[in-house]
């Protein structure tokens, strides 16, 4: 309508023998300024300064929105934040970055270069997997070296391994290889999922990740090495859809990377871009409620009772917390309290962060990442996900960032992170971590001294632990789960909480609890999806496009 009126106005001016070109330029200038002012009046609130929330804020900044990011913590990063004790920096959450091009694309969208903000280093091997029989399997990006490793340890499974990797590639190509694949598109309509079911059926997506690996290789150790990746996103390898088998190809193609300064350095860089865009971050600010008016989201209410009005709200809080707590006083049709309780939630995490002194020259065979397998795989996973009990044995994921990043620890010292998958708090008679935390930490220490870090107790300097109880309190994660809803077949795509709320216009979701799911690539993709869904008619790019089209049409 604005363009039609402008054309009519200019034709009238031409009839009056006024300078047509000059009038056009004046009107275009007025049009741009007016539209820019409208854009700046559109306010978006992002609840949560995790990777998903920060990425969404960056994208909305480009689209012309006034953005306010609020977070209850005193630092950015959410699960990707860090703490410092005695000169040791402990990364609390993700320790590796896969698919770094997603970060590069995000920065490019903002007209910037990621490498100007963050120093990302490739790591190889990705991780060393140890087994009780003494076997050490080095997973790495170089295809020929990886095949040599498989041939050395599992010679009868080399051909099966090759077939498995081809299968992994097909899954990746189908689900996540580009912006037009299901992992990077909105799944708002049931039809979006139904139309890909034939392809899912062809790839036997109904099989678990472990069952799919077992189809190709026979050695139980190699089956474990090719199927444990769902644990990185809180899933049961014996239940999670085989589509997650794509991770093996993803690692081979893009490698595994580490950010110098820890993952929190990425979050800080994202925050810097947001501020450069003229937008705001408010830490130590807890949102108690997302408020609605006439059925539409209209802002948030803070814990101090103050309200912040907004045109749209993007929640980076766990989707269970968003619908179960932040919208507690509002009637919901789909994600009711009852439905949330029926969901299967990801496992809990026990993480022991510890510092050592005079160890930089010790434990030469302990690199950046080590997976220490206990005597059981299926049985331990069953105890965690099905029985909900704290097993006597354990498997550990050990991170030693100081071998690659001197800033992580004092001189000659080391910083470590030992993660043990444990049950979440949703079981009857769930673990009382107030009583069990220290005894369990001691068991973790004993396991490390026996299997990986002999003499550890003689070098300990700092200690910090997190349990599912901390995840519940610090991150407001339902049942203290580490990764929101478990990424099972019928808790994925359309079946997962949507990126745009089904119940409340103006509410959008990013992060692990929405589509496409947990993991750094997943939460970055969720922000990309939300940016596609949010109207961009007042963005800077759209303003210029309208002006250019207007000039051509006159």
What are these regions (language model features)?
Residues 41-173:
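N-terminal glycine-rich phosphate/pyrophosphate-binding loop and immediately adjacent elements
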Residues 514-534:
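A conserved FAD-binding loop/helix module that cradles the flavin
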Residues 132-239:
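Rossmann-like flavin
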Residues 292, 536-554:
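Active-site-proximal substrate-binding core of FAD-dependent oxidoreductases
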Residues 359-471:
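C-terminal segments that line or cap access tunnels to active or ligand-binding sites in enzymes
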Residues 246-297:
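Helical element adjacent to the flavin cofactor pocket in flavoenzyme catalytic cores
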Residues 219-233, 391-399, 454-516:
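A glycine-rich dinucleotide-binding beta-alpha-beta segment and adjacent secondary-structure elements
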Residues 286-410, 551:
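Mid-domain catalytic core of redox enzymes
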